């Protein structure tokens, strides 16, 4: 039973989401440039980055870009307009048909908000996932219930994106370098995501010229358990990739743990000795993920 449990975790599909770059869907040059960037994820934005009168044209442009491909190993995500807007349903239809990997749904404050989009996706390919923006006070209060939709039959939710800018605005918080007002929002979202085995990405860092501050915030997000960070400028990609990649010594240790548990004398054990330390099955499970992420990055 022990060996089987470890093996199951090892075979789960894991995609690196260290860097997720927003790019305006109305900018044809940006859609083309995305094919050359080292971001794990490109998010083509039809919401905040597009004026109302340009929504339809931007939608068609993004759908054509996705359909034509050329983005390689990058995960291609489109941020649609909020479900209660007149553009959202057409966004979903066009981008699902084009073959986006995922749709990022803004202003998800309760499970029913995702349910609307899932209903529109009825009959669409099961591989199309949903990402949810957690960016309102009500979303923070409901974050566990929103995450639970991932476990429902046919649930498409696979990732949370924290919208720190909107949360700061709506809570009237005064943010400091340590992000003290945000600690509850961030931790609650990570906890809910982990409870239902979905990924979670940290919010953007607004001053893209402040690399030191950006690196500090990446380190903070990783410490809290984030899988990656959303970005507003290509200059932030390398730092995000570095911050959210497993360290070489951590990968070496993880491989050693897995090899130790595979030894015949350790089969079926929940705890073993390695290098003078007690290593538990939970460490083996953590090691599986570390190795899987490292291998996925190396194979990108």
Where are these regions (language model features)?
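Expand to "…catalyze enediolate/carbanion chemistry for C-C bond making/breaking, isomerization
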Residues: 3-300
């Amino acid at each position: 039973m022990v060996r089987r449990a470890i093996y199951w975790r090892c075979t789960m599909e894991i995609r690196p989401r260290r860097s997720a770059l927003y790019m305006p869907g109305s900018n044809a040059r940006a859609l083309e440039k995305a094919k050359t960037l080292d971001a794990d994820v490109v998010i083509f934005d039809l919401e905040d980055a597009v004026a109302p009168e340009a929504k339809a044209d931007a939608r068609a442009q993004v759908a054509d870009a996705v359909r034509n491909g050329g983005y390689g190993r990058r995960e291609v995500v489109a941020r649609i307009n909020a479900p209660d807007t007149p553009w959202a349903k057409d966004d979903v239809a066009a981008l699902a048909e084009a073959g986006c990997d995922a749709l990022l749904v803004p202003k998800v404050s309760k499970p029913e908000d995702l349910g609307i989009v899932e209903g529109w996706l009825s009959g669409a390919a099961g591989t199309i996932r949903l990402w949810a923006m957690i960016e309102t006070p009500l979303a923070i209060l409901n974050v566990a219930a929103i995450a639970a939709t991932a476990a429902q039959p046919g649930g498409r939710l696979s990732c949370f994106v924290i919208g720190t800018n909107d949360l700061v605005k709506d809570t009237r918080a005064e943010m400091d370098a340590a992000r003290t007002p945000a600690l509850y929002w961030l931790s609650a979202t990570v906890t809910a995501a982990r409870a239902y085995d979905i990924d979670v990405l940290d919010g953007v860092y607004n001053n893209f010229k402040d690399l030191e501050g950006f690196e500090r915030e990446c380190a903070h997000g990783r410490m809290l358990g984030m899988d990656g960070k959303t970005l507003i400028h290509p200059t932030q990609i390398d730092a995000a990739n570095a911050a959210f990649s497993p360290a070489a010594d951590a990968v070496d240790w993880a491989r050693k743990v897995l090899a130790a548990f595979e030894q015949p004398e350790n089969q079926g054990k929940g705890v073993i000795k390695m290098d003078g330390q007690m290593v538990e099955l939970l460490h083996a499970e953590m090691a599986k993920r570390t190795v899987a992420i490292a291998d996925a990055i190396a194979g990108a």
